[in-house]
C-alpha cells in the first residue's frame, strides 16, 4: 500500500482532513454569472479583469497557482511583478467573449505539473515575461481578426523573444492535513539578469461586508496581523472564528504589506467613497506605484503579501520558502531548514510511488508523463463553487417566491445552494460546473480518487442541485439548458470501480442515485418527448453548433426537431438504468420491476427510432441516422448532415450477462413474452433473446442490428469521412467538398466541414462541433465498440480504415481509435507533439516541449489543440485511454467477465483500477452473424 493511498484511506475511514486544503481557488472569478449584477446579463463587461484587482468578489476568489480551504475562507496565491507591468500579476489574463475572434481565451502559459489526490504534493508552472505584459496588444489585435483567422497568441507578440522570461514553479507539500509547506522557485531563462518581485499573498474571502446576504454573512470579521518572530523569519497570524487560527511563516525578514479585501469604490465608481482606508488593490499600488500609504502601517488587515524583491542572474534560480499551518501544527519556532526540504523530497517520492501503482508497466515513459500530467490537471481543476440561488435571485429582484419579481437568468432555480468543491471543465475558461462534463470527469478521477469521483456524481443528484422537477442543472449561464443524460452511465461505472477495488456494494449509494435518476428520467420523458412517441428533442445537447439550426432556439421553419442524438442518449439512459436496477434487485427484489420497465422502454425507443420509411431517422440509402425536421403540417424532412449526431445511435449498446438475467428472472421472462406479442419491437433493434445469445449466453441491447452496425462503421472508419489521424471527427470530411445547405424563406443555412475553430458566433463562438475531434464522444464510441466486441468476439470484422483491405475485430478498432487520440499528445518520430501544431516554441524548446496542455478539442486533420487550453475536464479521458489499453488486450477481454475485466493488482497496491473504459467491463461473445448458438 502506498503512502498516498494510506492518506486516502484515512481521509475516508477516519475522517482525517487530508483534502481540506487544496487547489480550490478559481483562476477567474471575474466575468462569471455569479458576480454579474447588471441589468442586461452582460457578465463579461459587468465585472472585468481591470476591475478584479480593485473590487471584492461576492461568491468566490481567484489567484495564480493558489490554494484555499474547502469553504474558501482563507486563500493563498502568488502575485508577481517584473518591474515593467502596469499592474501586479495577481491572476491570469485573457480575452472576454467579445474581445476574442473565437470567444473568450486565456492568454498565458501555465501548466499543472503534478498533484496527488490528497494534494499532499502539488506542482504548478507559470511562464512570466520579463518585458511589460502586452495586455493592450492582445486585445486590439484579436479584435481586428475575423473568425476565419488564427488567434493572436502571447508567443506571437514577441514577449518571449530571446527567452526573456521567468519559469515560476510553485510547489506545495503537506507535512500534515493543515500544515502546508510552500516552495517557490524562479528560474531566469533569459540572457541577462532581471528584476523580479515575488509576492506570496494570504487573504480572507470577503464574507463580512454589509452587502453580503445576512444568511451568508460572517458574525465576526476575520483578521490578519504581523507576529513577532525569531530573527530570520516573518510571520502572519490569521484568526477566523470558524476556520481557527493559522500562521503563515515566511523565510527571511521580508516586508509584510497589509490591506483589506474591500472594494476601491473611489477608483471604480465615480462619486462613491471607500468603506475602508485600505482596499483590495492597496498592495498593487504600493509595489507598482510606490504608494506606501496604500498599505496599513498598523500591520493588520484581511489581505497581506510578503514582498520578496530579487535580481536573478541569467540562467540562475532563486527559491523562497513559506509555511501555512494551523496554530498547533508547528511548535518549532524555526519552521524551515533541512526538515522542510526533506519533506518535499518525501512527498515527491510518495507521489512517484503512487503514480507508478496506477500506471501500466507496459506504458512508455512519454505516455506515462502524459497520463500523469492529465491526472494532475484533473486534480488541479478542483474549485470551490458557491451559489445561493435564493439570495442571488433576491439581489436581482427575480426570486419567484417573492412579490414584484421579474424573470431573469436562472429565476426558476431558487432552490439551489451550491457550496462545494467541484471538478471544473477549465478553471479559467469555464470556471463553473457543467453537468455532463462532470460525468466524464469522474472516469479519470476514479483512477486516482474513486471516493471523490463518487462524491461528484452524488452532488449533482442532491436536492440543492437537482431541480424539484427532476432536471439536472446544466451550467450557470443557463441552468435550464439540456445536456446529454450520462449520469446513470457514470454512476454505473463508479459502482463497478468500487467493486473492483474489493469493496462491498454500496447499496445506499446505488439506491439514492437510482431514485434521483428516476426523477431525471421522468423529467426527460415528460418534457422532451413532446408527443409521447419515444422520440426525443432536447435542444443543443452539448454539441453546440453541430446542427443546421441553433438547436436551442425556435426553428425558422416552425415545427420541431426529432433528434437522433437525443433519442440515442435516452436509449443508453434506459440501458444504464436497467443495469442499475439489476444490481439493486440482488439486494431488494422490488427493483426487478424496474428492470422490466427500463428494458421495455428501451424497446419502445428502438422501435420509434428505427421506424421504416421517410418518417424514420434511419436513411436506408445512405446507411446513416439523421435528425428529422418535423414541419407544422406533420411532414418530415431528414437533415442530411453526416455528423456525430448520426454516430451516437451506435453508442446505445450494452452487453447483458447471463448472471444479470439470473438476478431478474421474472423480468427476463416477461420481456421475452412482450417481444413474442409485439414482433415489431423485436424487428426494430439488435436481435435479442433465445437464438441470439453470444458466448457465455450473453445478450446485446443495441439500437443497431449487425447490418446497420457494418454500414455505420464503413463511414466511421473512412479516413475521407469520420476517421481522422487523431480520432473520430465530429462532422464528416465529406462536407468539406459537399457542404450541406438548407434554404428557408430565402435564407441559407449551411454546414461545412470546419476542422479548426468555428466561423460563427453560435453559442459564444468559442467551441466548434463541425469537424474537430472531441474526447467525450470518442470515449462513447470506444465504449460501444468494446461492448460489441465482447458480444461478437473475433467473428465480426471490418475494414479499418475503410478501403484499406485490413480487417480488424472491434477490439482492434477500439484500440486504433484510442491510439489515434493518445497520439495527439505523444512525441512522434520527429519528436513533435501534434497537440502543439506549428507552434515551434512548444515543439523544439526543451523548456517547453514536455509540458502538456489538454485542450478542449482538436483539429480534425492535424490534431492541434483548440479551444480552452486546460480542459483536463473531459480531455483528461486520455489518461483513461492510456491506462485501459496498457492493461487490457483482446484475449483478456474475451476470457474475462463483466466484473473480472476490471483489473486488480496485487494486495500491496490496493489502489489498483479497473482496466475497462466507462462501464464496459464485459466479456466477449462468440457470435457468428447469421449463425449464433441457440440457448433455451
Question: What are the functions of these language-model segments?
Answer:
Residues 64:
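Basic, low-complexity intrinsically disordered segments
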Residues 1-54, 72-74, 79-936:
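Acidic, mature catalytic/reactive cores of soluble proteins
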Residues 68:
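Active-site-proximal polar cores
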